[in-house]
Amino acid sequence: MTEPPDAPAIHLHVAVPAGSSGPGEVRARIDPSPGGRLSSLVIGGVERLVGRPNEGDRTVRWGSFLMAPWVGRLEHAAFDWEGRHYTFGANLGEHALHGLLFYREWSVTEAGPAVARLEIELGPAGWPFGGVVRQEIRLSADALESTAEIEAGDLAMPASLGWHPWFTRSSLGDSSLRIGSAETLETEPDLIPTGRRQPVDAETDLRDGPLLGDRLLDHTYVDVAGPAILEQPDLRLVITATDNVATYVIHTPPSGICVEPQTGWPDAPVLAGRGVAGTGLVRIEPHAILRATTTWRWSFPGRR
């Protein structure tokens, strides 16, 4: 059976004043399906996000998408909550990756020239607690602001949310990345966190903004202070977030650079259920809201 065609894309664009942050205009594209995903961001005439490999690709390795109602890996695609055991569909071996929404179609509630709002019901997506997730993406001449919220339904729920951008690697040279964190999470070989922290080492220490070189990172940085700063030969990108975002996953395969701000750790529902403290997992009371915002602000080297 063939899948239905994707919903029409939303196109955002903002004119850039001459001599300020770059030529022409800033353009963004949002695909309601799959995943309510930011699928393109053109700054200074250059595409800054890894593109969709093909029209049928509904995987995680392109664009920028929201992770909810959990982030990263969920061990064995299951967790216990208030005396009950809940299971979900595995999509990475025996584990469940990046929540329930990155491959589903979102409903568009507003589409203007510089702002888009989308939402999706969690119940039909397979979340037994119900609720709704909303996101707003707002574009300006020198920034993109994304706000997301999870609103509980009639039941309290465990939740976390985060963003998973795939930034392109520059063809002009190496990139540097600053993350203000002294610790990462220890993981098993399959990258499931053990719940223990470990100090950064020569490979994972990004506090001074080193060149990435050939580092192949896939690490969760905790208690992150200050912005994340990605510097490429032709663009400086400063990533900030609200105070409830203190975890960043950094993934640097050859195909792109992922800088993922999150309200909680990967596998937070499982770890919190084992008594691990500091996971960032939030209990959302009935009809209450978990909300967070991240902002990407850019400038061009040599321009004021």
Regions found by a protein language model. Give the residues of each.
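Hydrophobic residues positioned within well-ordered beta-strands of beta-sheet architectures
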Residues: 10, 28, 116-118, 133-135, ...
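Acidic, contiguous internal or C-terminal segments within carbohydrate-active enzymes
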Residues: 32, 120-170
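Active-site pocket scaffolds in enzymes
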Residues: 4, 235-304
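Beta-strand-rich N-terminal accessory domains
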Residues: 1-86, 224-245, 288-301
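Short Pro/Gly-enriched beta-strand edge/turn motifs at strand-loop
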Residues: 22, 57-64, 88-92, 116-121, ...
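Extended, loop-rich substrate-binding clefts of extracytoplasmic carbohydrate-active enzymes
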Residues: 1-4, 84, 90-141
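Active-site/ligand-binding surface loops and adjacent short beta/alpha elements
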Residues: 4, 158, 166-242
